[in-house]
């Protein structure tokens, strides 16, 4: 393990995610959405097509391996390599964890040199938007894109995590105008992303005003970063604060509803608490173009590429089966199709 504090932080995050089962909140709200089963689906399961496109790439089904990790250690390198190889094999998209670590510690770049393992699928670079208020700008963002050979850049928004985090950066003032400036100069599209508290109508409007066309809504109900950071702090009062806010925010279904008025102006990724292919189908019906999944892939990625592939293939089979049982053999049949939801 590198002595880099930021790499150690990345390892801490993974360790706590594995150790504390309550970090997975299991309150995403998808169970409250019921779909209309078709006993006579009038389609052939063998002909069900879950394929879609994302960032000018074809995907086998609308899965994005969502941001997890990266840093200057063999363990973190292995996770990212296994995820990238699995993404290529299964023809799904992949986003990396925050790349700030590779700007502060050049040894961490290896963790993000993934195009060699995933030559034909979308890869998304990742920077905390808050860093635009702490000295980062175009040069750092473009470097992240170039190292990954990325198709887009996540700018992640994590105000709750930063407030709880011992090393947190909390000046979010006038950030939208800096996002707009970066958007106008970067070589790839920017995707504005929360990390587990959801994006509201006002957030989406601010993003649109800044020229952003893609949003990852990342609602609550899955991994609680507030609870993870509560474990990391040595300040007992701060730890209690983290646990108090562990269920703060909009669920992913709630965020999708808030995004509905903007469907003609932007495209949306659903993530946060998506744990199976049925959740994915529900998200597409509610307006998601792509669905991000992270935590269910962490343990497989720590084990092997094949284990990761197996988990992705299970998600795909669940997605296709739900499509079939809804009588919707094409992806386009699902999108914003409210008639599939039981009133």
UniProtKB/Swiss-Prot annotation:
Q: Which UniProt keywords apply?
A: Cytoplasm, Flavoprotein, FMN, Isomerase, Isoprene biosynthesis, Magnesium, Metal-binding, NADP
Biological-process GO terms, alphabetical:
isoprenoid biosynthetic process
Question: Which residues take part in binding FMN?
Answer: 66-69, 98, 126, 193, 223, 273-275, 294-295
GO molecular function terms attached to this record: FMN binding; isopentenyl-diphosphate delta-isomerase activity; magnesium ion binding; NADPH binding; oxidoreductase activity
| EC numbers on record | 5.3.3.2
Q: What is its main location?
A: cytoplasm
Annotated Gene Ontology cellular component terms: cytoplasm
Residues the entry annotates as binding substrate: 9-10, 98-100, 161
Against InterPro entries, the record matches this protein to: Aldolase_TIM, FMN-dep_DH, IPdP_isomerase
Answer whether the UniProt record assigns the keyword Ribonucleoprotein to this protein.
no
Q: For this protein, what reaction is catalysed?
A: isopentenyl diphosphate = dimethylallyl diphosphate
- The enzyme's main class, written as a single word, is isomerase
Residues annotated as binding Mg(2+) are 162
**Subcellular localization, per the record?**
Cytoplasm
Q: Which cofactors does the annotated protein need, by name?
A: FMN; NADPH; Mg(2+)
NCBIfam families membership: IPP_isom_2
| Known role | Involved in the biosynthesis of isoprenoids. Catalyzes the 1,3-allylic rearrangement of the homoallylic substrate isopentenyl (IPP) to its allylic isomer, dimethylallyl diphosphate (DMAPP).
- Quaternary structure (record): Homooctamer. Dimer of tetramers.
Name-wise, this protein is: Isopentenyl-diphosphate delta-isomerase
Identify the coding gene: fni
């Amino acid at each position: 393990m590198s002595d880099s504090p930021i790499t150690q932080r990345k390892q801490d995050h993974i360790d706590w995610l594995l150790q504390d089962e309550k970090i997975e909140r299991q309150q995403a709200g998808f169970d409250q959405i019921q779909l209309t089963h078709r006993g006579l689906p009038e389609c052939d399961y063998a002909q069900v097509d879950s394929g879609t496109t994302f960032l000018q790439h074809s995907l086998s089904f609308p899965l994005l391996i969502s941001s997890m990790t990266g840093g200057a250690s063999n363990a973190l390198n292995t996770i990212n390599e296994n995820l990238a190889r699995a993404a290529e094999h299964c023809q799904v998209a992949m986003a990396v964890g925050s790349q700030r670590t590779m700007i502060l510690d050049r040894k961490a770049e290896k963790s993000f040199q993934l195009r060699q393992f995933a030559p034909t699928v979308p890869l998304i670079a990742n920077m905390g938007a808050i860093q635009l208020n702490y000295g980062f700008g175009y040069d750092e963002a473009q470097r992240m894109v170039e190292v990954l050979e990325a198709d887009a850049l996540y700018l992640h928004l994590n105000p709750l995590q930063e407030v709880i985090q011992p090393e947190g950066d909390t000046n979010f003032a006038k950030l939208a105008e800096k996002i707009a400036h970066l958007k106008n100069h970067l070589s790839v599209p920017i995707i504005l992303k929360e990390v587990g508290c959801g994006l509201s109508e006002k957030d989406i409007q601010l993003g649109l005003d800044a020229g952003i066309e893609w949003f990852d809504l990342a609602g609550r109900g899955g991994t609680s970063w507030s609870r993870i950071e509560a474990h990391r702090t040595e300040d007992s009062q701060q730890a209690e604060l983290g646990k108090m806010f562990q269920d703060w925010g909009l669920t992913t279904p709630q965020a999708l509803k808030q995004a509905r008025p903007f469907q003609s102006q932007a495209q949306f990724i659903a993530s946060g608490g998506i744990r199976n292919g049925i959740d994915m189908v529900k998200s597409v019906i509610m307006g998601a173009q792509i669905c991000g999944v992270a935590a269910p892939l962490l343990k497989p990625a720590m084990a092997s590429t094949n284990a990761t592939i197996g988990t992705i293939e299970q998600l795909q089979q669940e997605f296709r089966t739900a499509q079939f049982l809804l009588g919707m053999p094409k992806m386009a049949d699902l999108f914003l199709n409210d008639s599939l939801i039981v009133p």
